[in-house]
């Protein structure tokens, strides 16, 4: 068994795994535990009351976090003509068509997100085996296949995050950095929860948001009392 570091032991001692913490206390604990030598991510795990094995209960979407993610994002866009110019004006680092596809096939993928105009999917569709496993394949469900490429680029730059439920029925997302003020993290968490509520499958029965836990990159999970999320 791997030896538990003193730092980890200190975190474990501070957090009661069975307790539901008010959002203010949960954020304070998570930020306190984020004492690594780098600006740790603040992550959230949301257990949903769905059956992830059923295709009609797959929860997927995107949301622009009001306080951003604290990360700079490089955007590649498949577009031509006027839409290509609009994408560049919006801040896209890479814009192209067949030339961009060839770069990707050659392993040149210096970007974090791919956006595509619908008329380019004949090209993008050939890249599924490359982009898909990396989570980069454009999809209309998360707003990355759209005729309004300029807005999609701006959203990506502004702090848009994509979410998709895993096989265990859990959504994992980053809502900021340890350097963020607690109010900013709370605002981002509220935006994500609202987006998840809107994405609730019609066939989902019972309690939808079952558990919410926050953690930093090197910290431990802190469960959140959902009743305190509604209080401003």
UniProtKB/Swiss-Prot annotation:
Keywords: Repressor, Ribonucleoprotein, Ribosomal protein, RNA-binding, rRNA-binding, Translation regulation, tRNA-binding
GO terms assigned for molecular function: rRNA binding; structural constituent of ribosome; tRNA binding
A single cellular component GO annotation: cytosolic large ribosomal subunit
Pfam families hit by this protein: Ribosomal_L1 (PF00687)
Gene Ontology biological-process annotations: regulation of translation; translation
Domain of life: Bacteria
Keyword Ribosomal protein: yes
Keyword Transmembrane helix: no
HAMAP family per record: Ribosomal_uL1_B (MF_01318_B)
Function: Binds directly to 23S rRNA. The L1 stalk is quite mobile in the ribosome, and is involved in E site tRNA release.
Alphabetical list of NCBIfam families matching this protein: rplA_bact
Family (UniProt): Belongs to the universal ribosomal protein uL1 family.
Oligomer status and interactors: Part of the 50S ribosomal subunit.
PANTHER family on file: 54S RIBOSOMAL PROTEIN L1, MITOCHONDRIAL (PTHR36427), LARGE RIBOSOMAL SUBUNIT PROTEIN UL1M (PTHR36427:SF3)
Protein name: Large ribosomal subunit protein uL1
Species this protein is from: Burkholderia vietnamiensis (strain G4 / LMG 22486) (Burkholderia cepacia (strain R1808))
Name of encoding gene: rplA
């Amino acid at each position: 068994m791997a030896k538990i570091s003193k730092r980890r032991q200190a975190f474990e001692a501070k957090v009661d795994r069975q307790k539901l913490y008010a959002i203010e206390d949960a954020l304070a604990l998570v930020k306190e535990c984020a004492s690594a030598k780098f600006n740790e991510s603040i992550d959230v795990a949301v257990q949903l009351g769905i059956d992830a094995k059923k295709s009609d209960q797959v929860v997927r979407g995107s949301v622009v976090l009001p306080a951003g993610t604290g990360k700079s994002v490089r955007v590649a866009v498949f577009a031509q003509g006027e839409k290509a110019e609009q994408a560049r004006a919006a801040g896209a680092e890479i814009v192209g068509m067949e030339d961009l596809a060839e770069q990707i096939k050659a392993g040149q993928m210096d970007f974090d997100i791919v956006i595509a105009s619908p008329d380019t999917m004949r090209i993008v569709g050939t890249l599924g085996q490359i982009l898909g496993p990396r989570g980069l394949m454009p999809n209309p469900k998360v707003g990355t296949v759209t005729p309004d490429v300029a807005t999609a680029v701006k959203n990506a730059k502004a702090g848009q995050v994509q979410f998709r439920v895993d096989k265990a029925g859990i959504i994992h997302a980053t809502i900021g950095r340890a350097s963020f003020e607690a109010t900013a993290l709370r605002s981002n968490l509220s935006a994500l929860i609202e987006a998840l509520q809107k994405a609730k499958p019609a066939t989902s029965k019972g309690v939808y948001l079952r558990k919410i836990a926050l953690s930093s990159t090197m910290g431990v999970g802190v469960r959140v009392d959902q009743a305190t999320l509604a209080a401003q």
